[in-house]
Amino acid sequence: MAQYELLHKELPQVTYDPVSRILKIEKKDKKRSGLIAVCTAGTADIAVAEEAAQTAEFFGANVERIYDVGVSGIHRLLSRLAVIQKANCVVAVAGMEGALASVLGGLVSRPVIGVPTSVGYGANMGGISALLTMINSCANGVAVVNIDNGYGAGYLATQINRLGVHDEEA
């Protein structure tokens, strides 16, 4: 926060989001296109998800946030499936065992980017268990970024979204 305050004195247009820990300067009235769905398994994954969502918005995408829809309460995910299926790309952020990316990969026909998080307990191993689950997924169309890499997922999702927007315009 101290870095933000110092920078904000020199650049008053700088904003800081304490949840995602993103510091940014954005153009006003930015045009956004397409749609990316950013989903979390649990509420503990929201910080990384917000990093992905805000990165995608910064680079020009519309983002639908769908939080706390993990496999332990699959009915919550299924109740939001129609919205998720409209997206050009889906970002699945999950700690613990990381199953959300595989489940989404089996339910949607769009690319899914798995983001393992370091949250969890027991044999979570700082996100390694979620990472291994995601990279060993048998669901087609699932790609995985590194542990807690919301920025990387948001940027990649934006590139995929642009391809979808281009296809819609053609």
Residue ranges of predicted features:
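Helix-enriched interaction subdomains in cytosolic or periplasmic regions
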Residues: 1-18
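Short, acidic/small-residue loops that bind anionic groups at enzyme active sites
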Residues: 15-20, 104-127
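Glycine-rich oxoanion-binding loops at beta->alpha junctions
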Residues: 22-24, 62-83, 128-129, 145
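Glycine-rich phosphate/diphosphate-binding loop of Rossmann-like nucleotide-binding domains
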Residues: 33-73
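Buried hydrophobic positions in well-ordered alpha/beta secondary-structure cores of metabolic enzymes
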Residues: 38, 56, 91-93, 104, ...
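C-terminal binding/interaction regions
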Residues: 40, 81-85, 89, 117-170
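Short glycine/serine/threonine-rich phosphate/pyrophosphate-binding segments
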Residues: 45-50, 74, 94-103, 124-125, ...
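Glycine-rich phosphate-binding loop
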Residues: 79-117
